[in-house]
Amino acid sequence: MITNDIDKLSPDDFSIIFIATGGVERLVIQHFESLPRPAILLADGMQNSLAAALEISSWLRGRGMKSEILHGELPETIKRIFVLHSNFVAQRSLFGMRIGVMGTPSSWLVASNVDYLLAKRRWGIEYTDISLDRIYEYTDR
């Protein structure tokens, strides 16, 4: 994709950034705000593309952005792309959904709390607390 077209991507587009050559690192990071998240970088190993992808990935991760480099044997790379696409489709299908949370974790469970805001940011999911009293009302009918 030509960098002028990067703004035409929507969150519903599954995107892979093909790093065809070295020397494009600065160009990619100039478009940091427009990059798909997570950033999937495809390097073919020619023209210093792998080195450039590693440099870009390191820069992105240093700024808290997830990235993955696809590189290696073609059949495995293709399989990985299919997995990433399936994950993308599944994640997009969750966007806008509401999940009812019944009850709360016991106080002795120190790692079982759900960060509602983080889930909304990552997946577009809204959690709604449902009291157990409300559940009992429906089951007593």
Question: Where are these predicted regions, by residue range?
Answer:
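An N-terminal assembly and electron-transfer interface module characteristic of large anaerobic redox
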Residues: 1-141
